[in-house]
Amino acid sequence: MATTPTAAAFSITLDCRLDNVPGTLGRLALAIGEAGGNIGALDGFDVRGPELRRCIVVHCRDEAHQQKVVEAVRSLKGVTLVDWWDRTFRMHEAGKIHVLTSAPVNDRDDLSMAYTPGVARVCMAIHNDPSLSHRYTIRKNTVAIVSNGTAVLGLGDIGPEAAMPVMEGKALLFKEFGGVDGFPICINARTADEVVDFVERLAPTFGGINLEDIKAPECFEIEERLKASLDIPVFHDDQHGTAVVTLAALWNSLKITGKKMEDLSVVIAGMGAAGVAIGKILINAGVGEIVGCDRTGAIYAGRSDLNAAKQWFAENTNPSRKMGSISDVMHGADVFVGVSGPGLITAADLRNMAKAPIVFAMANPDPEIRPEQADGLAAVMATGRSDYPNQINNVLAFPGLFRGALDVNATD
């Protein structure tokens, strides 16, 4: 079985004090390597007489591997491990975003325009013409990132507090890649009625609503109701952002493999928000055959345990009524699209696919099959992770989509 590679997501920083004698640094580097760590960076030396002080960044495989590297360093003669920390957790301390001002307040004139009395004039202008709120307030460039934490990445229903790091990351990416001010709002709301009511009350503050990590089937109802009731764009990124980047990746993959959209047989693993939306966009793109699978197996017309979203999927896909497990329906398929969970498929499944198979294993944080396991078996191999080549992630779509929507004051 392929060894899980080291990654920045599990990297650590080692703050070390070394005896200032030849060979000490070499022994330290060797110990890290023998423990399976991959040195990512060496900070500059701080020479203090008979001692050297430096920080070393080491990429590890997982948290257990982090501890193995730490213990290897601690056991070295002539090296003292002063401190160490997980770089991912360190990045998240106190959050990843903060609020900045865009207007100066250098004197009384500035203050009188930014706040009272001058602000009252702007308030009344908006009162007389509410559309001016998109010009004279943060609505012009601000999106609410709303989640109830019921379907976070591949982690599941982990709650609103635990969803916050993802939503903060989303806000960071909105700003970095689209210049959009996104604000994370994680709410303690379980039902569709609660989420809809909250967002409707919140809407006057924002120029758009990005729904995120809300479980199916509630997410479908929530988006439909909000689109009908609000006059600003409402976008469920798990559905449409993922669908957009999947179709883009498939178009490019066809250029490599020489296959045609209308001839494809596509298997989609995962019938939540993303899987259903991907199916819909592939239907519109003209894909020849689509078979969806959930935990029970293939989705087909006549299956008795389907919710409304899956029922629609059954009626509009899988014309041959293929049945069985994910492995069964992957026989002869051209494309595998995974939006489910880790380790779902094997190398044997890829061998059973059609010639030059296209594999999109997009489960996060861990894919349905790792690229190392698919090496030499797939014509195109992609994941949803940013530390592998060929990333298919909605971060490639949502900043630009909202940038455009805000710029034209879109209402849908």
PLM regions and their residue ranges:
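ADP-ribose/adenylate-binding Rossmann-like module
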Residues: 210-213, 337-391
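Short glycine/serine/threonine-rich phosphate/pyrophosphate-binding segments
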Residues: 24-25, 137, 153-155, 195, ...
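Glycine/serine-rich phosphate-binding loop and adjoining beta1-alpha1 elements at the start
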Residues: 81-264
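Adenosine-phosphate binding glycine-rich loop
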Residues: 233, 237-238, 257-263, 363-412
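A conserved regulatory-domain signal marking ACT and ACT-like small-molecule sensing domains
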Residues: 1-93
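Glycine-rich phosphate/diphosphate-binding loop of Rossmann-like nucleotide-binding domains
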Residues: 153, 158-178, 230, 236, ...
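A short, aliphatic-rich alpha-helical micro-motif
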Residues: 203, 261, 329-330, 350-353, ...
